[in-house]
Amino acid sequence: MRHDQLFLWYLADPTHPVYVGQLQLVDAGKGVSLQYGTDWLANGFPLSEDLLLANIEHLPRWKGMAVGALDDARPDRWGERVIQYIDKPARLSLMEYLFYAGDDRFGALGVSTSAEDYLPRASSPLPRLSQAQQLSEVVHKLSAKEPINNIERQMLAAGGSFGGAKPKALIDIAGEPWLIKFFNNEPIDVPLIEHASMTLAKLAGITVAETQVVPLVGEHALVVRRYDRKGSQRIHCISAGTALRAETIAGQEPNLGYPTLAQLLRRVGVSKDGVNLQDMQELFRRMVFNILIDNTDDHEKNHALMAVEPTAQGKYRLAPAYDVLTTNSGQGYQEFIVGLDQRDSTLANAMSQCTLFGYTSAQAAAEVVRVIQVVNGWRQHFKTLGVCEADLDSLAERIDGDPLLSQRQNFNPADYATPAARTKRRSPFA
């Protein structure tokens, strides 16, 4: 079945869905628009800053995307692959991907075939943690394009809800939906290393999504607690990319980076008790940590905001960090802009705009020292969690390689005791 028109619902309380508006396929099948319904215009809230409460058809401003916050409700590479394999839609437009992502997607939005009742794609109960081994085997079958039976299809179907390139699915742990991420034939034990990286980040004062390692036959999987769920309630969330594009003037390229996101949090974050300032400063620590552990996959989809007070002026909190792990690339630049030297993976670059995160230069330098002290203990921390010596040696080539180790060793907070004119410094990766 082709879907040229579908309907958007808000599922903060899944037992009482609220109709949001109508979705329409546009741009020759490469975009999806939204027009709010009358009740949502009267009682709802803008789903993102580019989706104001106006009685118009909101059109996507970038090709190949659904409009505004709706783009975060669609799957990405792995999810699309699952949908193609499981559902086999007659057409592969954005509208099909939005619909077949099902009911339990990221955030609190749902897609229905009806504006009168919430009628999402039919779904089965999530597999339980005790079925993780079987689920892993099904994922490997899909990756190898091997046939699977109906029971295996039902187990895997929830994997169409999420983005990213690597194999994942939803799994039930004690009645709560968690994300499970599988080993993907990498040369190192990525699930275990991600758990070690996330728990190391927590030691550095970074709020992270809860993770657990699941032992499987010959490998590990990683389960991640969903921060967009609180009991039976769902939290409306948007990616950093959506938030930053929403404030971008039409025709211009968005400034996708840490400093810009910090300034957005200053403006639209929860201001009561200085919560937005706390989030801005945590974002700085996250940036420094990512640089020092060689996490260069810190792109716009790997940061998110939670609308904890959807109808308030200052409604957003910085979501817990996720997908934090050393990428072992040594490329010397981040995906997200760091500072005046753009994406260069240097502490000097991180410090270049530190005042945009609500710090003085001296305060920011003290935070860098704190993160350095934690990262200096990375090897023992990883070893304690079971990372093997071969993987530790492989990671050490990057984390303790000269470009990053020299920055940890040579960073001097006294250099930032008083503001001074900045000169561009040569990258240690050059």
Per-region residue spans from a language model:
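Phosphate/dinucleotide-binding and metal-coordinating scaffold of catalytic cores
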Residues: 1-296, 300, 304-430
